[in-house]
């Protein structure tokens, strides 16, 4: 009996030599474009197409892909990836081209004519899109195959396709996001196995499903086969076959077939009717593996769903869903695999038993468990005592009770599952409904520091730099107000417990700064002085003395501060209070021990690459909070190294909101005069157009390059003239494939050259002249984190307009 792979290869050669296939051969010198009618090569029947497929939800970018051409949603079965050790899906912008050159080379090029993908086949006489869904490139002579998509699968296999040991399927991140996902089907010499993976590093956790292993036989697996009857099985060298799927197989004549490793980690075999009907047509899963992925557990990692969530399986449609417990919410409603976070402040370990019982209670949920997350257990015990022991334990977030046994668990919770077979009752600790504890909801949880509580009414917790903006905008936006100082009554100290700002007297701040003696720096609207409060801790502060004041009404100011004053983020400098006494206007901030990024980065000693990476991510996350996580969007308008401060742990914090703009709900742009600092301002500042959050994205792109290279954007004394302006030079280095020149002498960065290239590409996307071409700051953070693939950035001349 011939091995299955040999039979498949023989069948493929027959197809290549048939008249119908030859009629569809792709000739040398042929090309495809992203737009227009010539964007794909079809198989003889028209069932499959190979070419440019628009990204779902973003028609400006394309995959080089194969798809079911006669199905309305054009379901992709293959898409090109990079040739890196951890291949990433390739996305190209409009204007890209795929050439099958006269020398027999298939080459994908972006609008700048830079090659972004090449399968490595040379001297090919022709290529073909076959009716099997396989795209093949013939070897010289035309009798054998040099390269084919069936040997380079992504997340899907088709009928007649086989996977041999060493080949793998990688799930997508989401159905509409083709970035590498969290699950892998790996063909090994001893078995076929499904793994959970770490994103973005790609390391494997424990397998959650595999074929049986015979310890007495080595190299026992031959292939995973999707045969012409619709069966999917793993063939062994001893002749046995292990069925991967066991669904009711539909006919090949009436149905399209595929098998996909889906974003939820389930390997599903699907069918789709070829003939249109009055019924709604869709892919139907006829078989799955594993039968219930919610039962999968890993010793490391979050499990099937993200941390602090639990998995539910619906057997009626073979679908899984991830759920947050009550009073928890997803970090990202779209990317639910990132897990859940509490919508409340976690229990302080300073609370005694009485206080804990007064402030916290439990939500009870049946048939739920988080296996492997317990750190303590008791037996025999009743539920009331289990409840009490968890309630007084500040580490205990959840207690699980079953048959007189109690398990205590702390965050993060992993391997969460709900099902009728889970004979457990969970007690989830939450604040009591009448508790005065504020919910954090969309902001990061503030972990209270015992020393700060000592300050009591002197420094209320949770002060926000956003309140800084609210006050600064009131004091500085003279363009938009006509009310004089005498019309404004001094702001009284807040009696609202939700307004965590202290109203300082001028005398207090004059004493704290020793008569405004030590200057820390100058901002857009005043001078910043170092000070020290006369409290029990001797807290150091930074006091900004505002000049050139113009006001809006006190009522509008109070409403705005009360609206956003409770928010907080680790990457924003925290505002502690203010002074609004007579004609004096001062702002009080937390003091940043390590000064500004400007001084830290350009002082002559190159910081570690790993630290620069964390600083870049911190600035991006701070901007993400301003742009997309606040209830009211904030445009900073003056992002530069001088306005990025570093605390004692070298965490980057955005400061100086004196030029910021606040957008109303549903407002996406504003019109205002030029703001910002030369070398960091976006081109649209010099045009009569609306200003959007993309001006901050542009400024971040400049800072990102400065962090990569440890030099300022403009250095007219540079050794080489082409290196004088960093944005020019970085663009040239990237286009020439020499980003290593940007980190010359930095051994740590060169060891991470792939990440350097990734960061440079992100920066060049941020520096696009057209604002709509720049990614959102959310997309920027995803690309920096490695969660999203990065298309090749167009060659933009935006930097010219940065220096009027």
UniProtKB/Swiss-Prot annotation:
Domain Bulb-type lectin: from-to ranges: 24-150
A single MF term (Gene Ontology): ATP binding
CDD domains documented for this protein: PAN_AP_plant (cd01098)
Record key words, sorted: ATP-binding, Disulfide bond, EGF-like domain, Glycoprotein, Kinase, Lectin, Membrane, Nucleotide-binding, Receptor, Serine/threonine-protein kinase, Signal, Transferase, Transmembrane, Transmembrane helix
Membrane-spanning residues: 459-479
Major subcellular location class: membrane
Positions with a binding annotation for ATP: 520-528, 544
Domain PAN, first and last residues per copy: 349-426
Any Pfam family matching the protein: Pkinase
Protein name according to UniProt: G-type lectin S-receptor-like serine/threonine-protein kinase LECRK4
